[in-house]
Swiss-Prot record:
Cytoplasmic-side positions: 1-17, 37-57
TM annotation in the entry: 58-78
Protein name: Gamma-secretase subunit PEN-2
Tissue: Widely expressed. Expressed in leukocytes, lung, placenta, small intestine, liver, kidney, spleen thymus, skeletal muscle, heart and brain.
Name of encoding gene: PSENEN
Intramembrane region ranges (chain numbering): 18-36
Function of the molecule: Essential subunit of the gamma-secretase complex, an endoprotease complex that catalyzes the intramembrane cleavage of integral membrane proteins such as Notch receptors and APP (amyloid-beta precursor protein). The gamma-secretase complex plays a role in Notch and Wnt signaling cascades and regulation of downstream processes via its role in processing key regulatory proteins, and by regulating cytosolic CTNNB1 levels. PSENEN modulates both endoproteolysis of presenilin and gamma-secretase activity.
Family according to the record: Belongs to the PEN-2 family.
Length: 101
């Protein structure tokens, strides 16, 4: 989609939809929101909807960073402690690696 062909109101509406969609456990939408609207929020000359778009982009960045930290922490903890959790670790695993820990 070419954002230059879209009205400022429609840009704001689309940015808001991607921001709200990220709350449905879809942090990828926040990343898309950041990439698509960063230029509109911070680099183009000012217009009336820009401050709202800027807010959505900032909040999308914070939400995406939060999800990256949470998922990285969980993956690290799970990879390190899964063998110690015994049956629970096996139950949470999609595939169980062969061999000894």
């Amino acid at each position: 989609m070419n954002l230059e062909r879209v009205s400022n109101e429609e840009k704001l509406n689309l940015c808001r939809k991607y921001y709200l969609g990220g709350f449905a456990f879809l942090p990828f939408l926040w990343l898309v929101n950041i990439f698509w609207f960063f230029r509109e929020a911070f680099l183009v000359p000012a217009y009336t909807e820009q401050s709202q778009i800027k807010g959505y982009v900032w909040r999308s960045a914070v939400g995406f960073l939060f999800w990256v930290i949470v998922l990285t922490s969980w993956i690290t903890i799970f990879q390190i402690y899964r063998p110690r959790w015994g049956a629970l670790g096996d139950y949470l695993s999609f595939t169980i690696p062969l061999g000894t820990p």
